[in-house]
């Protein structure tokens, strides 16, 4: 089992893995219903990807670039498993959290700023709903176990990952269907992503 973690602050890594074959089994620590094949893996800041792989050669991790690749690392493989048993890759145990019900309310959080991002109402380079840096008061307050739909709107010229502390949420597909269960979603430039979250963990949590 191999876990990839993007610990960078703002770099999105498109990765290519060589020397292994297998499937993605979890995203941000939450098991997928069905393990997925992979070729290239895109991992945004704070995101995690878990794989179960069969190692056939030296593991090579390359970052894909416009004009080639940059080698991030290599893991040498030594010895041979003489008792190897071939079996299908099964799904990991599912989260005990049920899929949330219909939302009690719907909110919108708009990211603005940065180079080519245009003016906004904040007083720094970036803003969320026209507020820069930490607000004087929490953006919103929720009752325990309240289900909320949030539209994350990226009006900047760059893709941006949004990470919610203390909770996981469901990404919603364009048709409204429930997608992956994770705590960090990548939003493309001039794009948006709807998420559905049941706020069941009391506390003061950052969304960044």
Question: What would you call each of these model-derived segments?
Answer:
Residues 1-103, 172-188:
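Histidine- and aromatic-rich segments of cupredoxin/plastocyanin-like copper-binding domains
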